């Protein structure tokens, strides 16, 4: 499975909204086996959203700011009310087709202006 993630970088002012798109070359398992991961500078990636839209437990930032949506081959992560703390954070999608067929998107870096 091949995951195409866009954009590779997004520059937004504080308080704005970021939309990240992820497209699978073929439908993921059960149409919803798509995860989003969040990687802050100097840290390993952490699970943010599972099953396309289910927020992971223990998300430290305001969980209401993160929303996952989509099904089949098209998925979206929306981050609202971007904060300074979001700067240089990279988000990755991961599609799951089977136990030995899963892949990450190329990542999207959030650049915060101001």
Swiss-Prot record:
Which Pfam families does its entry note?
V-set (PF07686)
The protein's name in its UniProt record: Ig kappa chain V region AH80-5
Q: Name one GO cellular component term.
A: immunoglobulin complex
Sorted keywords for this record are: Adaptive immunity, Immunity, Immunoglobulin
Residue ranges of region Framework-3? 58-93
Enumerate the residue ranges of region (Framework-2): 36-50
SMART domains according to UniProt: IG, IGv
Quick one: where's region Framework-1? 1-22
Region of interest called Complementarity-determining-1, as start-end residue ranges on this chain? 23-35
| Source organism per UniProt | Oryctolagus cuniculus (Rabbit)
Residue numbers spanned by region Framework-4: 104-113
What's in the misc comment field?
This chain was obtained from antibody to type III pneumococci and was isolated from the serum of a single rabbit.
* Span list, region Complementarity-determining-2: 51-57
Listed under GO biological process in this entry are: adaptive immune response
